[in-house]
């Protein structure tokens, strides 16, 4: 397809934009609101068959920290793109990166897409890179059975197989979702005081300056 386009909520993650630009897509910026991307614009652009997908970080979106609302996520699930191969690239990198228990939980887009008759609309992925080892964690992808067949078809040429020892290390260390949650609380205990110190210094030095 000539003149392929990809939707890029902006501001957003530069690596996402670089990937699609490298593969020859025209990048279309989508404005971000307090509850997520401008869905009127997303729906309008999705009516163009040359638009092939959209990048999304639904929780703590780079760099603003926005969390997509339930309403926005449900509109994503209900999309009827003109291109049959349109895909939502749902980068749920920060799905468990919460400092406290009051953080809103976002709906399961994959389940919503299936319920809406759009099972193949989304690729959801994440990793432990910001939980265990930056650049050396393990990754995960969730998608429909048909999409997983496609993904495996590409991966078998990209790699012989995953680092199974690294997978074993992670499985033995974290054990389950409770283990992951406990690790994130340890991160929070280290990071929260640092953020509070920075915020305090900024307020002390800059309040009233008009900056």
Q: Where do the PLM segments sit?
A:
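Structural signal for well-ordered, non-membrane alpha-helices
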Residues: 17, 192-195, 199, 203
């Amino acid at each position: 397809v000539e003149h392929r386009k990809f939707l890029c909520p902006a501001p957003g993650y530069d690596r996402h934009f670089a990937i699609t630009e490298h593969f020859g897509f025209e990048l279309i910026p989508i404005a971000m609101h307090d509850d997520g991307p401008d869905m009127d614009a997303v729906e309008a652009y999705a009516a163009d068959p040359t638009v092939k997908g959209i990048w999304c970080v639904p929780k703590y979106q780079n760099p603003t920290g926005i969390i997509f609302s339930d309403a926005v996520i449900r509109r994503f699930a209900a999309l009827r793109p003109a291109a049959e191969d349109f895909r939502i690239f749902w980068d749920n990198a920060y799905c468990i990166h919460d400092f406290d228990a009051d953080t809103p939980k976002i709906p399961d887009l994959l389940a919503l897409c299936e319920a809406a008759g759009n099972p193949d609309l989304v690729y959801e992925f994440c990793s432990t890179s910001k939980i265990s080892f930056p650049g050396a964690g393990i990754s995960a992808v969730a998608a429909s059975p048909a999409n997983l067949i496609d993904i495996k078809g590409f991966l078998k040429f990209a790699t012989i197989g995953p680092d199974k020892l690294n997978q074993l290390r992670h499985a033995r260390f974290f054990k389950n979702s409770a283990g992951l949650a406990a690790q994130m609380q340890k991160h929070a205990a280290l990071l929260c005081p640092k953020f509070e110190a920075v915020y305090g210094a900024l307020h002390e030095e800059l309040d009233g300056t008009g900056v």
